[in-house]
From Swiss-Prot:
CDD domains: TMPK. The gene is tmk. ATP binds at G11, T12, E13, G14, V15, G16, K17, T18. This is Thymidylate kinase. One of its GO terms (cellular component) is cytosol. The keyword Transferase applies. It comes from Psychrobacter sp. (strain PRwf-1). Disulfide bonds: none annotated. Transmembrane segments: none annotated. Signal peptide: none annotated. Phosphorylation of dTMP to form dTDP in both de novo and salvage pathways of dTTP synthesis. InterPro entries: P-loop_NTPase, Thymidylate_kin-like_dom, Thymidylate_kin_CS, Thymidylate_kinase. Its EC number is 2.7.4.9.
Amino acid sequence: MSLGKFVSFEGTEGVGKTTAINGLCERLQAQGIEYVRTREPGGSPFAEQLRELLLDTRTQINDDTELLLMFAARSDHLAQVIMPALSAGKWVICDRFIDSTVAYQGYGRGFGNADMLHKIEALIAGFVPRLPDITLWLDLPVAEGMQRAGKRSVADRFEQQQLDFFDRVYQGFEAQQQAQPQRIQRIDAQGEVEQVADRIWQSVSQQL
């Protein structure tokens, strides 16, 4: 049995990942493709507990602790959900993965500091056995995304950050896309829902 495909979605706050993933899953189902839909941080029972801690506005931890908790959640998620699904020939559709860690912890928290980025690279090398086959970076102006995200009822610990934090996060996604253009594909997230869905499908269908 051939391995399934691993697709991740990335972007700053309010870019429309949930809607985009809904659309892709509908198209995969129409093609008769089995898939597992998951998310980070989270995705497995233990990782979901860590997600609650990481997103709780009452949580006060330093940047290194936050980074290590992200990878603790990811390690369990990979072992319990992602790798078994791929081995069974299923596609995995993941809302955020390693590129969010680089963008949020490496650039948002770490200001693109080489020391923090090296720590992340070492953790990826040591604990991530499989990168996504394709990563869809939903590209939307930060201010527009924040305006969308602001309509949500309750902001989590990351959503409460200031605009300059998300400007750095955006720079992190942009830098990764430029460094890995084959894996990380930029998707214009502006326009109607179906327009964005078509752009995504154009990229993903190449994996069929």
